[in-house]
Amino acid sequence: MNINIRSNPMRKWFIWAIVLIGCLPINKALAQQSGDAERNTLRIMSYNIRNGRGMDEVTDLGRIAEAIRKVAPDVVAVQEVDSVTGRSGGIDVLRTLGERTLMFPTYAPAIDFDGGKYGVGMLSKEKPVSYRYIALPGREEERVLLWVEFERYIFCCTHLSLTPEDRMLSLPILRREAASAHKPLFIAGDWNATAHSPFITEISKDFLLLSNPKQATFPASTPDSCLDYIAGYVKNGQPFTRLSAWVPEEAVASDHRPVVTEVRLKAKPEEIFYAAPYLQNPTEGGITVMWQTHVPTYSWVEYGTDTLNLKKARTIVDGQVICNGLHNKIRLTDLRPGQTYYYRVCSREIMLYQAYKKEFGETAVSPFYTFTLPSASQKDFTALIFNDLHKHIPTLDALYGQVRDIPYDFVVFNGDCIDDPANEKEALYLSLIHI
């Protein structure tokens, strides 16, 4: 029973960890899958807070913080923010909001004002990698663009001029900065431009509006105009998909309502696979190929007796391909005993899966592996059996060192290799350790 993958030692594909997924309680497994499926999803918010002064002329940062907490964004672009001014009683407004929302504050002053500064800011769940700010035109008031880099994306915040000419003069600067980005870039803020204005028409040539311009944001009590926007840079391709957009019904805390959008960032091909594929159930002229991905995918197996003439296998139930999940299980059938087969697995990310709209990302393709089903005359085989590892890597290292050079047909990881896994990530724990 020769079931081997291409020069891939046993300890580089810990199938025992993955097999334990089946032992998880269903609700825990589903909850964990949902969490992993959303790992690339980003909730973006933009809010002109008028320094916390509401439609009732009461300044209350608690209301602003509560409006943000209700949305639970990953990142917020904030406009009209005081920093230790007399008007704000010497308070660092953005830092105060950061403390109340448990988010990192990043500030960009636009002007000196009342003994302190006045400008824009950003709140983020993730600590920024770097930030800078760039001056923008504004004849009635100086303007600024706040550029903040995170691990996977760049987010910019600005409050554009009331003057149409200055807004148009800002466009080349916005385009220049966006073109220099080496990650997906988003920009948000109060742009002081209505949905059908020349500025929105022009910026839409390079940026995709992610918020809904048909939903009014100003004035907050009875909004009749959209002045607040979130957009993504798409001139060099679209590395994300918009999932949803809305305007929360916050009518009092500020004179603007916030805008919110959710996007999913595309995974790079090398980020799609969780670990190498593994084989199960080599019976009745067939074998099952299984593997996991970090993101929802449409997946298939390509296989054949050589690497040039390949068949494609998928899992089909009632005429429909099973997809849009993280766990892939595909059965190869009509195989000949004693014949060596080559195979590789392919997974294409599903960015959006709706009844009438589907969007796809990149495709990951594994190297070729091989397996040979046992022939009818084969009676002998070699198996490696491990017990009671208790997630102890040094023990696995030592045991593997004793059998490193033994050609084996399959591996059995018996009881207590992982102690009572609480969730899927724990069950998959060792499959990521490439010792």
For each predicted feature, which ranges?
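N-terminal, active-site-proximal structural segment of metallo-dependent hydrolase catalytic domains
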Residues: 29-100, 112-113, 264-270, 275, ...
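Active-site beta-strand/loop signature of hydrolases that rely on acidic residues for catalysis
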Residues: 42-49, 64-88, 155-158, 174-201, ...
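Short beta-strand segments enriched for Tyr within beta-sheet-rich domains
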Residues: 291, 301, 338-347
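Conserved small/polar residues in nucleotide/adenosyl-binding loops
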Residues: 433-435
